[in-house]
């Protein structure tokens, strides 16, 4: 309830230095007619030159305007919820307003600032004029309870009332040493105030934490010796950040700070059609920047949308760019549920585009805003409308609504995947179900590691599981392969199915499948189809080879693969990877190159498979990676310098480089063939 932005206090330096000009000159062309004729004195009407009259705001005016604009945004977006106070400091601290609701308004603050006025240049240069008086008063103001805190105290609940706040000090310091002294004084006074808040004095509330923001203001074009510094924790009670900014840019800086202080976002409504003042028959497009809660964008954006952001000239913060949508008739298909509404306030409330947009909305009209999708199209994501004299931005639901029915898993996300193996996944979950046992089962740890190692999520990502839709005996055959307790009769039945596949391959029958993994395949040859099928079948049997019957099936399949010519090099290994591999695919079993007859190929395959089965449980991931690196290194010759140099010594790179005798010998050997060629030609 009581957050850090509940209390914000502006401390404005009212010393003599703030009476100087900001050096940002504004041209004032008050004559619409022709420029006055130069009489030779170099001045025209009113003492102005041909360029017109120019004036510059003082540092005090820049500080007052930007700070009042800060509190206007706060009071527009959080009416009656967030409090802002002003303290003017010169020889003493002058309180502009209090935490009372009657003084938390723009008219009271502006009237008080008019009474304070610009600092006089004839003000004496004395140490009595200091911003420290205002900082002391700001700490005392933080200890004063607001109306909400007083209501909590009056309720009689014995709870600790959080009391945090933020102090924004607009001053001008000479160097970093002066800034360090301000921090130390502020921290000391803060500790003293908390001591007074405790018993027996009990003067005000204890300050749990304070955020001090110091804005060091300098005229335009003047270099400052004070360096910028991000948020720094000075003590458990105090965080300090320092910003050095020129006077004309202080409004942009405070707008940037208010975004973080109150979790706001900036949105620029672009391409607003507006009639020109000079020519009512033509119109131009204008942009209006508005501020609102950051949640207006976060709750509306989904994964298919990206916020278009940009940085305005002179600003340091990003603004979201939304395009004005031309009003059109909305049918039932265009109606969208609203996810939330948030108050809106313009950044430049006095500009003509802002006033036109505000009047347009206050007259009962609504504005739809568009944002782009990642695919390139656009969607209506927000709407501006007014109710009760206040303007709101509505976040529209541009993704799947919570009121829509959830899609079935068979439809897939967005209807892109439709062949999920939901039934098989349910069976796998039932088979992998674990229950607590009183005694340890030695076979229990191996079961969850073995079963989910290869499970294609869709039928289209596997040839083997894709065929069970078209071959009647294939589902029962796959069920027998993954059984943990296969008997001899089931082994014979599986052997028959494997031989049946071999007979079909010998006849050249095409397998009854069309496509896999959503791609159009070019497997016109039956040999390519059966090669991929055999390799995936071997992987599945190898993963479930826990009994003697499984191992017999594996040996039989490998013998058939060798007889069918699978022991040769595989040109379509990339096809196999695209078909059979999934995130849970096992390591591929590469065949051994053949060097003789089919019988020797079968024996070598059987020996290799037995060697793999005996060592698969003992090899670690490091062993697998090391063996792969060694096999890759053995394919190419090592560096000759490493081979010829004894161990422990450094090989010399290009040892014959620069050896003149060696070069002369090489030149002689190259010249001899040339002489011989000339003698032959002659």
UniProtKB/Swiss-Prot annotation:
Q: Which keywords has UniProt assigned to this entry?
A: Cell cycle, Cell division, Coiled coil, Cytoplasm, Developmental protein, Differentiation, Meiosis, Mitosis, Nucleus, Phosphoprotein, Spermatogenesis
PTM section of the record? Phosphorylated.
Which family is this sequence assigned to? Belongs to the Integrator subunit 13 family.
Cell location: Nucleus; Cytoplasm; Cytoplasm, Perinuclear region
Q: Where is this motif: Nuclear localization signal (NLS)?
A: 606-612
Q: Biological process GO terms, please? A: cell differentiation; cell division; centrosome localization; flagellated sperm motility; meiotic cell cycle; regulation of fertilization; regulation of mitotic cell cycle; spermatogenesis
Q: Does the keyword Protein biosynthesis apply?
A: no
Q: Does the keyword Cytoplasm apply?
A: yes
- Gene label: asun
Signal peptide location in the record? Answer: none
Pfam families xrefs: Mat89Bb
The segments labelled Disordered in the record are: 571-612
Which residues fall in a compositionally biased region of kind Polar residues?
A: 571-583
Q: Which organism is it from?
A: Drosophila ananassae
Q: Which residues are in coiled coils?
A: 517-570
**What is the protein name given in its UniProt record?**
Protein asunder
> GO CC annotations?
cytoplasm; integrator complex; nucleus; perinuclear region of cytoplasm
Supply the PANTHER family for this chain: INTEGRATOR COMPLEX SUBUNIT 13, SARCOMA ANTIGEN NY-SAR-95-RELATED
Assembly notes:
Belongs to the multiprotein complex Integrator, at least composed of IntS1, IntS2, IntS3, IntS4, omd/IntS5, IntS6, defl/IntS7, IntS8, IntS9, IntS10, IntS11, IntS12, asun/IntS13, IntS14 and IntS15. The core complex associates with protein phosphatase 2A subunits mts/PP2A and Pp2A-29B, to form the Integrator-PP2A (INTAC) complex.
Chain's role: Component of the integrator complex, a multiprotein complex that terminates RNA polymerase II (Pol II) transcription in the promoter-proximal region of genes. The integrator complex provides a quality checkpoint during transcription elongation by driving premature transcription termination of transcripts that are unfavorably configured for transcriptional elongation: the complex terminates transcription by (1) catalyzing dephosphorylation of the C-terminal domain (CTD) of Pol II subunit Polr2A/Rbp1 and Spt5, and (2) degrading the exiting nascent RNA transcript via endonuclease activity.
């Amino acid at each position: 309830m009581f957050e850090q932005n509940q209390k914000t206090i502006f401390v404005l330096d009212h010393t003599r230095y703030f009476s100087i000009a900001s050096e940002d000159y504004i041209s004032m062309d008050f004559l619409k007619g022709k420029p006055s004729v130069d009489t030779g004195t170099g001045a025209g009407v009113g003492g102005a030159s041909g360029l017109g009259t120019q004036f510059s705001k003082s540092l005090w005016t820049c500080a007052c305007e930007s700070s009042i604009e800060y509190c206007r945004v706060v009071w527009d977006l959080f009416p009656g919820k967030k409090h802002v106070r002003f303290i003017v400091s010169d020889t003493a601290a002058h309180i502009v307003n209090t935490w009372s609701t009657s003084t938390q308004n723009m008219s009271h603050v502006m009237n008080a600032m008019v009474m304070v006025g610009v600092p006089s240049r004839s003000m004496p240069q004395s140490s009595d004029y200091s911003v420290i008086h205002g900082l002391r008063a700001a700490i005392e103001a933080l200890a004063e309870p607001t109306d909400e805190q007083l209501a909590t105290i009056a309720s009689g609940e014995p709870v600790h009332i959080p009391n945090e706040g933020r102090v924004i000090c607009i001053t001008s310091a000479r160097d970093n040493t002066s800034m360090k002294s301000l921090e130390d004084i502020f921290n000391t006074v803060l500790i003293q105030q908390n001591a007074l808040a405790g018993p027996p004095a009990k003067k005000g509330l204890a300050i749990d934490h304070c955020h001090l923001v110091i804005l060091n203001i300098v005229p335009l074009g003047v270099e400052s010796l004070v360096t910028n510094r991000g948020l720094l924790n000075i003590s458990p009670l105090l965080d300090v950040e320092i910003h050095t900014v020129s006077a004309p840019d202080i409004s942009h800086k405070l707008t940037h700070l208010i975004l973080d202080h109150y979790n706001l976002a900036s949105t620029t409504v672009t391409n607003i059609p507006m009639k020109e003042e000079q020519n009512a028959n033509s119109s131009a497009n204008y942009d209006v920047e508005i501020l609102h809660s950051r949640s207006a964008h976060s709750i509306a954006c989904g994964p298919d949308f990206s916020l278009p952001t940009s940085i305005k000239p002179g600003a340091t913060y990003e603004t979201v760019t939304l395009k004005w949508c031309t009003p059109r008739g909305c049918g039932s298909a265009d109606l969208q549920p609203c996810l939330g509404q948030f108050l809106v306030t313009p950044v430049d409330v006095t500009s003509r585009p802002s006033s036109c947009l505000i009047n347009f909305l206050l007259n009962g009209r609504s504005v739809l805003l568009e944002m782009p999708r990642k695919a390139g199209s656009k969607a209506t994501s927000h709407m501006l409308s007014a109710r009760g004299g206040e303007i709101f931005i509505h976040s529209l639901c541009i993704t799947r609504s919570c009121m829509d029915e959830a899609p079935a898993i068979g439809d897939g996300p967005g209807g892109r995947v439709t062949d999920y193996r939901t039934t098989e996944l349910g069976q796998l979950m039932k088979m992998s179900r674990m229950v607590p046992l009183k005694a340890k089962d030695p076979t229990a740890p191996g079961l969850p590691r073995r079963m989910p190692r290869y499970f294609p999520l869709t039928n289209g990502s596997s040839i083997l599981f894709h065929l069970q839709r078209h071959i009647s005996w294939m589902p029962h055959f796959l069920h027998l392969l993954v059984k943990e307790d296969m008997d001899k009769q089931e082994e014979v039945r599986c052997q028959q199915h494997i031989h049946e596949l071999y007979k079909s391959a010998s006849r050249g029958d095409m397998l009854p499948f069309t496509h896999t993994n959503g791609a159009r395949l070019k497997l016109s040859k039956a040999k390519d189809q059966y090669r991929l099928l055999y390799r995936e079948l071997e992987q599945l049997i190898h993963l479930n080879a826990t009994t003697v019957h499984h191992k017999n099936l594996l040996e039989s399949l490998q013998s058939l693969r060798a007889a069918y010519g699978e022991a040769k090099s595989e040109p379509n290994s990339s096809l196999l990877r695209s078909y059979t591999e999934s995130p849970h695919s096992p390591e591929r079993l590469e065949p051994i190159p053949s060097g003789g007859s089919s019988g020797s190929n079968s024996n070598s395959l059987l020996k290799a498979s037995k060697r793999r089965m005996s060592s698969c449980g003992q090899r670690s991931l490091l062993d697998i990676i090391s063996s792969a690196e060694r096999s890759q290194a053995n394919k190419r010759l090592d560096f000759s310098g490493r081979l010829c140099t004894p161990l422990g010594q450094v090989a010399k790179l290009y040892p014959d480089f620069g050896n003149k005798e060696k070069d002369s010998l090489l030149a002689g050997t190259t010249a001899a063939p040339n002489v011989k060629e000339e003698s032959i030609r002659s």
